Amino acid sequence: MVVKVGINGFGRIGRLAFRRIQNIEGVEVTRINDLTDPNMLAHLLKYDTTQGRFDGTVEVKEGGFEVNGNFIKVSAERDPENIDWATDGVEIVLEATGFFAKKEAAEKHLHTNGAKKVVITAPGGNDVKTVVFNTNHDILDGTETVISGASCTTNCLAPMAKALHDAFGIQKGLMTTIHAYTGDQMILDGPHRGGDLRRARAGAANIVPNSTGAAKAIGLVIPELNGKLDGAAQRVPVPTGSVTELVVTLDKNVSVDEINAAMKAASNDSFGYTEDPIVSSDIVGVSYGSLFDATQTKVMEVDGSQLVKVVSWYDNEMSYTAQLVRTLEYFAKIAK
């Protein structure tokens, strides 16, 4: 059975999700909704500065574009309630606009001619299940209509924090994400549409302190860590490729080797492990949601207790997208 997917919002995440889905048997995108002209959407799908050229053919046609010989309908509806997903057989929508990230808003896709399920590509709040694949996807039972795929940083932090907590018990922690600049920052100094004075400064020329909800949102993914972590972000002048540092106190004293062994044992398709001396450009395009860097593990003795630092890399674009598509595929498979 082929699962038919619709994408609402064909920006960075929407386009990269489309690319990923092209390589998955049994899943296909049959409709895209975006207010941008299809000629522009097709061009941005074909050419990508950070992720490279699309491996396939893209041709603009009346009403959409043809990708590898398959026609994809493109509509331009502002209100999800007006998108006729059903005509194209869409069962599940990837909500990637950023404007319908809360449950009530995302549910607008579930109208009479709409879809059956929605995956939000952003933190969704306390009233939807927040899923980081291979960390807590087993909380889904298939009856849900709207779920959240969390944020890119939460997808990096969660598997590392879970492995650490399962092995040694986290008491408290602070995380910092050193994060690539994104489209919500100015390329040159100028007024920021959200009124943020720091994001109004040139993103490719500054280290820009920013907030992140990833640490606090960890409680939605790993309930036993609720209230135990906090954190912040520093946006840096790279177009993609980010890293998360987590400093914690643990229930027991440990060594660097013990920590690294626990992380290696916890590795899977979503949580990678490396001992190579890599830099940020080396993780562009990786499909791990989080790539643990064993070379950066630190343990400091402090008056009989310890401070422990662990580090994991992520491509804030492709790592996150790969996780979203894993979640979407699983969600469709168990749907009831």
From Swiss-Prot:
EC assignment: 1.2.1.12
Record's miscellaneous remark: Binds human plasminogen.
Annotated organism of origin: Streptococcus pyogenes serotype M3 (strain ATCC BAA-595 / MGAS315)
A GO biological process held by the record: glycolytic process
Function: Catalyzes the oxidative phosphorylation of glyceraldehyde 3-phosphate (G3P) to 1,3-bisphosphoglycerate (BPG) using the cofactor NAD. The first reaction step involves the formation of a hemiacetal intermediate between G3P and a cysteine residue, and this hemiacetal intermediate is then oxidized to a thioester, with concomitant reduction of NAD to NADH. The reduced NADH is then exchanged with the second NAD, and the thioester is attacked by a nucleophilic inorganic phosphate to produce BPG.
Chemical reaction(s) catalysed: D-glyceraldehyde 3-phosphate + phosphate + NAD(+) = (2R)-3-phospho-glyceroyl phosphate + NADH + H(+)
NCBIfam families per the UniProt record, alphabetical: GAPDH-I (TIGR01534)
Record-marked site positions (Activates thiol group during catalysis): 179
Oligomeric and partner information: Homotetramer.
Binding site for NAD(+): 12-13, 34, 78, 121, 316
Keywords: Cytoplasm, Glycolysis, NAD, Nucleotide-binding, Oxidoreductase
Pfam annotation, one family: Gp_dh_C
Active site: 152
Major site of localization recorded for this protein: cytoplasm
Any one of the GO CC terms: cytoplasm
GO MF term list: glyceraldehyde-3-phosphate dehydrogenase (NAD+) (phosphorylating) activity; NAD binding; NADP binding
Encoding gene (name): gap
SUPFAM superfamilies: Glyceraldehyde-3-phosphate dehydrogenase-like, C-terminal domain, NAD(P)-binding Rossmann-fold domains
Disulphide-bonded residues: none
Protein name in UniProt: Glyceraldehyde-3-phosphate dehydrogenase
Intracellular or extracellular location(s): Cytoplasm
Superkingdom in the source lineage: Bacteria
Family: Belongs to the glyceraldehyde-3-phosphate dehydrogenase family.
Binding sites annotated in the UniProt record for D-glyceraldehyde 3-phosphate: 151-153, 182, 199, 212-213, 235
Pathway assignment: Carbohydrate degradation; glycolysis; pyruvate from D-glyceraldehyde 3-phosphate: step 1/5
